[in-house]
Amino acid sequence: MGGGNMFTRREFLKTTAATGALAATSGLAAPAIAQDAAIKLGYVSPQTGPLAAFGEADKFVIDSFLSTTKSMGLNYEVVVKDSQSNPNRAAEVAKELIVDDEVNLILVASTPETTNPVATTCEVEEMPCISTVAPWQPWFIGQQGNPGDPTSWKPFNYAYHFFWGLEDVIAVFTNMWSQIETNKKVGGLFPNDGDGNAWGDKVVGFPPVLEKMGYALTDPGRYQNMTDDFSAQINAFKSGGCEIITGVVIPPDFTTFWNQAKQQGFAPKIASIGKALLFPQTVEALGNAGHNLSSEVWWTPSHPFKSSLTGETSSQVAEAFTKATSRPWTQPIGFAHTLFELAVDVMKRADDPTDSDVVAQAIAATKLDTLVGPIAWDGKNLPPFAAKNVAKTPLVGGQWRLKDGGGYDLVITDNKTAPNIPVGGKMEAIA
């Protein structure tokens, strides 16, 4: 059988359902979805495993979404799946949502290890998918058949993504570094995963930009996640005279690295780390040693945006989370909330929520002001190859500051990349 004639299981289900409906109505086409049938959303995120901090707010966001839509007279069902922080599991549960649960749209969040296998599965199965919380390069390039050959890259028909890119995080980090006097020697912590390979890439990652800006990068090579000994990296950074550390590290690994760096007498002036330092619990786990660690900041209670679904401000959503959970707010709250804002907006505009092509077209036509800023897949500030499938959101930089009574505050220290997001202070050296 030629590849062109291969039926996806989804097409088979759609065709048999349609012929069944026609037969049952003696030739009169039935409406595509019964008036009172729920619109079914699938949601995938890492709720357990080393990436679980990303999924901490999911239950709160989904519970709020279901009560909001119910009060608006909208009928939604959300089928939640845990990727267990495992890419193979993420692909499996995406297939389950499509084949067994027959969802109308899949939403997925948090790191390329979650977003990519889900988006790839959706693309193959012709299931519309909206993803977030992974820089767009590892999301888009990482799903290509040949990531090393840009001429072979193809856009997607069903997978759409919103977040910032490596160009943004590099700008944010170097803007923060320029506020402090250093020898411009940088140590890179890049693991052997989707993010690490992209951030450390000699073409799209940190190396070429840092070189152009006069920074000397010491990159000891890719390491495996869940490493328990960072002595080789620490020795390389000491030998290189590094006063700045950067990289993209999963939360448990940064705790190991930072504790070992302290024990081995390595004390950089700046540590700007992606991924690990997004979360208060990672910083709290370091005791006082988390003071003045810096990170990318994609959403905070002071972001000047409102939910299109509830009208709540960023600060109201963050307060509601803390009230419901007794936990400090975390950055993924804003993006998880926005996934559901987009779902409602898309389904409102899709004439037939059960038709994958109609839903995908509605996603492509989105123009929505959300809790994380304006979202439109219009190609703005993107290279042509990613213009169809990626929408960019703003990024700033911040530092964790010890509070008098214990715990930490995240203070925005640089907003050159998004001046509408207010700063709360200036960069301070760690030591």
Predicted regions: what is each one?
Residues 4-23:
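N-terminal secretory signal peptides and thylakoid transit peptides that target proteins
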Residues 42-61, 81-88, 110-111, 189-200, ...:
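Extracytoplasmic "Venus flytrap"
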Residues 53-60, 68-145, 162, 223-230, ...:
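Beta-alpha junction/loop-to-helix N-cap segments that form part of ligand/metal-binding clefts
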Residues 136, 261-337, 349-350, 413-419, ...:
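Extracellular/periplasmic periplasmic-binding protein-like sensory domains
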Residues 2-6, 28-46:
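C-terminal segment of N-terminal export signals and the immediately downstream linker at the start
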Residues 103-220, 270-295:
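Extracytoplasmic ligand/sensor domains, especially the bilobed periplasmic-binding protein
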Residues 112-123, 228-229, 235, 240-264, ...:
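Hydrophobic alpha-helical
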Residues 320-333, 344-410:
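Segments of small-molecule ligand-sensing domains
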